[in-house]
């Protein structure tokens, strides 16, 4: 049985239509990245049963702060340092495959953030003023 060019074209088109979504889903799972504790479902640390097992890295002058984002170092004695040389060490947190836990009282919408300095609450990769953190 011989296939005509038209039949081969339809067969190829059908295969592409069926395989393209599968390929896109596979690629999406492989390239999705995240930092410290803001990983979406499917991200590199997104295993639901895995809870943070270690404290986030120390940073700031004399290591008195903790990393709460890729360029954010916060501590009670120093407030929050964002994008400064003291906060650069926080980028190394991305190299770890294990999630870390940010210390501090829960705050923010639905208590998903942590008080990291006097009056400052950080949620995932954003920080804001919060009266509960005093």
Swiss-Prot record:
This protein's GO CC annotations: extracellular space; secretory granule
SMART domains per UniProt: NH
Keyword Signal attached: yes
Pfam families xref list: Hormone_5
Expressed in which tissues: Expressed by the venom duct.
Leader peptide range in chain numbering: 1-33
One MF term in the entry's GO annotations: neurohypophyseal hormone activity
PROSITE patterns listed in its UniProt record: NEUROHYPOPHYS_HORM
Assigned keywords, A-Z: Cleavage on pair of basic residues, Disulfide bond, Secreted, Signal
Matching InterPro entries: Neurhyp_horm, Neurhyp_horm_dom_sf, Neurohypophysial_hormone_CS
Family: Belongs to the vasopressin/oxytocin family.
The protein's name: Terepressin/terephysin
Source species taxonomy: Eukaryota, Metazoa, Spiralia, Lophotrochozoa, Mollusca
């Amino acid at each position: 049985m011989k296939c005509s060019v038209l039949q081969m074209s339809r067969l190829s088109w059908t295969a592409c239509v069926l395989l393209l979504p599968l390929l896109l889903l596979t690629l999406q799972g492989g390239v999705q990245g995240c930092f410290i504790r803001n990983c979406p479902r499917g991200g590199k640390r997104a295993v639901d049963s895995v809870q943070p097992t270690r404290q986030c890295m120390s940073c700031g002058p004399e290591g008195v702060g903790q990393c709460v984002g890729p360029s954010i170092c916060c501590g009670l004695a120093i407030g929050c340092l964002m994008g400064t040389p003291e906060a650069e060490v926080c980028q190394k947190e991305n190299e770890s495959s294990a999630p870390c836990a940010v210390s501090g009282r829960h705050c923010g919408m639905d208590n998903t953030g942590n008080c990291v300095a006097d009056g400052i609450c950080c949620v995932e990769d954003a920080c804001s003023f919060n009266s509960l953190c005093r």
